[in-house]
Every structure is written in C-alpha cells, then in structure tokens.
C-alpha cells in the first residue's frame, strides 16, 4: 500500500472529548470517526485491525469445533416477550415498530434468535452437541456511552451458543470454549485474567469473565495474592472472618440521641463497628410495582447490590433492579433512618435478608425501630426463620475463600464472557428434542461472547504509549512502513520502491510512505499510527547499504544490512 493512496485522515489534535488512549490515539490517527453518541465509523486502518482480530477469532473457534453463521440484527419483540427479557433488560433494549405496527428489537444479545433456530431444526439427540457462532453488529442503548469503543452503543460482537442433551456435555463445551478464548486473547498479545462473574441480564447458573488489567478499567476484580482465585467484585467471596473479642452484655435498650451511623454507634458504645447491625433499605423495582427490602450487614461491611438483587430473585421476587430508599420512602413505611432493626420489621418491609456472616451473630447492637434508641446484647439466634445469604462486598482486608491469602482490588475491562444457561431459554421458548429413549427434553445451553470492537480499544489501553498507537503482533494494520528521508532524491525513491516490492514478495504487509512531506512529520505519523516497524531509506542507506529499522513497541533502533534485509525483517516480525 502506498501512503499517498491510503485514506487515513490524521488530525493535529485528538477529539476533544477523548480522555483515554483508546479513543484519543485512533481518533487522531484516522482509524475511527464518531458520528453520534456511542456510534463510530471504522475507517480503513481500523477495519484492517478489526479484520485481523476477527481472523484470529474465526481460526480458534473453528479449531475448537464451532460453526460460523450470521443471524438477523433485527429480532421480533415477541421472542423477547416469551423469554421474559423484554421487560427485564430495561431501557438499554431499543424497541421499534415497523410500518405494520409490529414490534422489533435491535439485538444486544441473540439468545432468543438462536433458540428459535434450534427449536425448528434440531429434533434429535443425534444432532447434538452443536456450537454456532457469529461476528456481527449489535446495539445497546447505553444511557451514558463513554470511553470510546469500550462502552459504545453500536459495537461488533462475537456471539456463540451451544446446545446439548445433558449438563455433562455442556460442562465439556464450557471448558472447551474457555480454552478457545484463552488462545484468542493470547494470540492477540493481551495480559488477561479469567474471573468468576455474575450472569446479569443473560442469566444462567455459572459464568466467567475474561478481563484485561488496566488502570482505566470500568470494572473491579478481586484477586488473591497467594493463589489463582479471582472474581468480579459483584460476586467475590471471602473466608469466614475471625470475630474480635467482646464482653457479653445483657439485652437492653439504650437512648442514643443523634447516633445514626454504624461508626457513630460503635463509638457511642466504645466497641468495634463489627458488632453493629447496619440496616440498608432498598426499593425493589418489579415489572408492575415497587416494594421495600431491608438488608442487614455488619457495621464494617457494605452491601453488594448485585448479590442482593440475585438473592431476592432466588426468593422469587422477580426484581428488575434495586434503588436506595429515600427518607420519604422510609417515612411511608413507618421506619426511622439510623434506628432500623429486626424487631417488628416484617410489618414494614416485604423482604428481610441478613448477611451470612451474621449467622452466629450475638452481642450485637441493633436499631430499636424507635427514634434515638438502640438495643444491645442482641443474639440473632433468638429470631425465627431468618433468611441468610452472601450479600456483602468483599474488602481488600478480607481473606481468600480458598487459601486465606490476602485479597486485592484491580481495575479491569471485560473483553469476553462465557455462561452456562442451562434450560432457562429452552423452557421459555419451548425448544426441545427427543433423547435416546424417545422422550422429549429441553436443551441445555451455553452462551459465549467476545467484544471484537472493544478488543481494538483494549489492546491500545494496555499497549500504547503517549506518542500513539502500539499494536500487538497479530493486530497491527501494517507490518512495516518504509519512510523515505528525501523523496526528491531519485536514488532514495528508487531504492524505497525496490525494498517495498522485495518485502511484498516475502508476504510482508508493507506501507510505503511516498508522501511529499517532511521526514519528521512522517516519523510522527509512524509513532501515531503504530506500524510494527519503520524502515528508513536515506542518504546514508545509499552510501552504506544499511537500513535503520525502528520497533514501534519500544522505539528500539537496529541497523540491517541490505543483503540480510528480508531475513532480518521476517525474524523481527516473528519474534514479537
């Protein structure tokens, strides 16, 4: 490719709203162009990178037995209604009507579509297992698109779905796809972790995220410093804590004027917040109503909203989301902020859940459900039919549930997610097959996704520097850019074109910078665009028969003799 023919409209300054490297560098380098909030055009350089990411993905998925298909971007809303997700997914789901007043959705995920295909064409266990995948455009109506392609509204996604006759077969494919994803991300040169995760709106019994560690990450993962335990903070667990020493006290009610927070209550009674029962009241949003739930945790813990919501739904609440109850909500329920406790609480709220760390809770200080009063010496074993669950957010001071090692937070970006869906979609959409005994059974399903366009951003966040884009071995738009020092020197120009042809013949993806521009400007574009190598052709090259070669990853310079040029270039490209 000749640079003079390349459509790469570079800018003097990055886009004004670009904060991170991933929208800043490709925006300035002419990779992408934003035409709306969270909506981007991919120009030739970005399309080359995306194609390379997709090629790696296709190769590894097909090596692991998956078959490539292409599904409709537009799906009947009635399918989403059958699965129950039309309301559950929320406002991020874009719903529209056609001219005949039929409802459709722009797909953010395709569980309903693929299940409909399976229901119509997979009739026997003999056709199982099967794993189908696609790479296609998706749409999610994000309320606040941010970080460029990391959190865009329109994006490119690799979606995969597998169908099985039993859970054992699904387990095998889950691990098979996990291996494929590890190979894909390794081929792309990323430093990543696999963590236990929440299934979110997609649902399912088990899920794992593939995350890339980066300081600009929008997610927090919890990692053990001693073993391989890692989990998204939304579901992270900890080992049972050692209880501080506390002298037993008799059950009594004390006046505690204006003492409404766990730390202030602990200070008032000269004890640790650990022994204070903290009440957190939330509004539970259902499809057609709102209720109240009260969650109890120790005073030095915080509620993890995802765990709390999942626990409610395990109890049959069919909750869509949680919102913190305000003073008006509490007043309507007859509750007093700062003094809420378990005594007589059932008449005020619909759901009461205690963190599992409170199962043996005694010597507790709790709100008396009376203004300016707390009860001390409370033993929860004296209450009947309490519901316990893991609802707290793990802290960095907590210990690993596997080995007791120290847990630490890391910022990360999710790039892939795999789920065991079980039979949930098959049951709701009536997708079944005949087993070996001739009995009708529902499919066991798996779901597997990788953010293709997000990977473009993530690679830049992890690899780039302040000068511009740095790509990995299998993702750079060009292997080599040939930079002519003085294009008006016919000898330099002639040699540059000869070298260009020599490299093309060896299969090197080369770009010849034949623009009539200053040498410094060309080198700045090399640093900005991020070809893997820059090969300099100048006056000294003509005299010494040696080329200066610069690696973009670390800007390391190397001298290469003309006679060894192709061999050395291929070695350098293979080694990174």
Curated annotation (Swiss-Prot):
Keyword entries, A-Z: Aminoacyl-tRNA synthetase, ATP-binding, Cytoplasm, Ligase, Nucleotide-binding, Protein biosynthesis
Matching CDD domains: ProRS-INS, ProRS_anticodon_short, ProRS_core_prok
SUPFAM superfamilies the UniProt entry points to: Class II aaRS ABD-related, Class II aaRS and biotin synthetases, YbaK/ProRS associated domain
GO molecular function, a single term: proline-tRNA ligase activity
Catalysis performed (reactions): tRNA(Pro) + L-proline + ATP = L-prolyl-tRNA(Pro) + AMP + diphosphate
One Pfam family from the record: tRNA-synt_2b
Annotated PANTHER family: MITOCHONDRIAL RIBOSOME PROTEIN L39/PROLYL-TRNA LIGASE FAMILY MEMBER (PTHR42753), PROLINE--TRNA LIGASE (PTHR42753:SF2)
Domain commentary: Consists of three domains: the N-terminal catalytic domain, the editing domain and the C-terminal anticodon-binding domain.
Family: Belongs to the class-II aminoacyl-tRNA synthetase family. ProS type 1 subfamily.
Quaternary structure and partners: Homodimer.
Name used for this protein in its record: Proline--tRNA ligase
């Amino acid at each position: 490719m000749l640079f003079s023919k390349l459509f790469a409209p570079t800018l003097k300054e990055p886009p004004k709203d670009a904060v991170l490297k991933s929208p800043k560098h490709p925006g300035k380098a002419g990779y992408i162009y934003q035409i709306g909030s969270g909506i981007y055009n991919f120009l030739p350089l970005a399309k080359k990178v995306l194609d390379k990411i997709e090629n790696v993905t296709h190769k590894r998925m097909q090596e692991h037995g998956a078959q490539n298909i292409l599904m409709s971007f537009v799906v009947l809303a009635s399918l989403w209604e059958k699965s129950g997700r039309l309301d559950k997914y929320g406002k991020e789901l874009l719903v529209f009507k056609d001219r005949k007043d039929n409802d459709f959705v722009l797909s953010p995920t395709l569980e309903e579509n693929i299940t409909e295909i399976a229901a119509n064409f997979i009739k026997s266990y003999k056709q199982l297992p099967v794993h189908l995948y696609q790479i296609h455009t998706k749409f999610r109506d994000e309320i606040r698109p941010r970080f460029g392609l990391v959190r865009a509204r329109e994006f490119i996604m690799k979606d995969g779905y597998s169908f099985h006759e039993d859970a054992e077969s699904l387990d095998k494919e889950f691990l098979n796809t996990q291996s494929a994803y590890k190979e894909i991300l390794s081929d792309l040169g990323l430093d990543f972790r696999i963590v236990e995760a929440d299934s979110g709106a997609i649902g399912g019994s088990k899920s794992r995220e593939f995350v890339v560690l980066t300081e600009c990450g929008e997610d927090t993962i919890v990692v053990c410093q001693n073993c391989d335990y890692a989990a998204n903070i939304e579901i992270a667990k900890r080992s049972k804590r050692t209880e501080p020493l506390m002298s037993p006290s008799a059950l009594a009610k004390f006046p505690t004027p204006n003492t409404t927070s766990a730390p202030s209550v602990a200070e008032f009674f000269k004890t640790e917040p650990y022994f204070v029962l903290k009440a957190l009241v939330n509004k539970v949003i259902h499809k057609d109503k709102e209720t109240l739930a009260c969650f109890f945790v120790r005073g030095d813990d915080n509620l993890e909203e995802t765990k709390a919501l999942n626990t409610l739904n395990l109890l049959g609440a069919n909750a869509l989301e949680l919102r913190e109850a305000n003073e008006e909500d509490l007043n309507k329920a007859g509750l007093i902020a700062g003094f809420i406790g378990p005594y007589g609480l059932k008449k005020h709220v619909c759901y009461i859940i205690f963190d599992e760390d409170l199962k043996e809770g005694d010597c507790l200080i709790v709100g008396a459900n009376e203004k300016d009063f707390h009860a001390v010496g409370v033993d929860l074993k004296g209450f009947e039919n309490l519901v316990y669950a893991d609802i707290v957010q793990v802290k960095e001071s907590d210990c690993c549930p596997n080995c007791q090692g120290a847990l630490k937070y890391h910022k990360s970006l999710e790039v892939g997610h795999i789920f065991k869906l079980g039979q949930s979609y098959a049951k709701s959409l009536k997708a079944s097959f005949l087993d070996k005994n001739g009995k009708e059974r529902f499919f066991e399903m798996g779901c597997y996704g990788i953010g293709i366009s997000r990977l473009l951003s993530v690679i830049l966040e992890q690899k780039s520097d302040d000068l511009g884009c740095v790509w990995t071995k299998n993702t750079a738009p060009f292997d080599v850019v040939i930079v002519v020092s003085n294009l008006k020197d016919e000898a330099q120009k002639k040699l540059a074109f000869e070298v260009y042809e020599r490299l093309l013949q060896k299969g090197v993806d080369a770009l010849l910078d034949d623009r009539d521009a200053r040498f410094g400007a060309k080198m700045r574009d090399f640093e900005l665009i991020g070809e893997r190598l820059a090969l300099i052709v100048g006056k000294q090259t003509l005299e010494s028969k040696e080329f200066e070669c610069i690696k973009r990853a670390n800007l390391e310079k190397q001298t290469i003799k003309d006679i060894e040029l192709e061999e050395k270039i291929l070695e350098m490209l293979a080694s990174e």
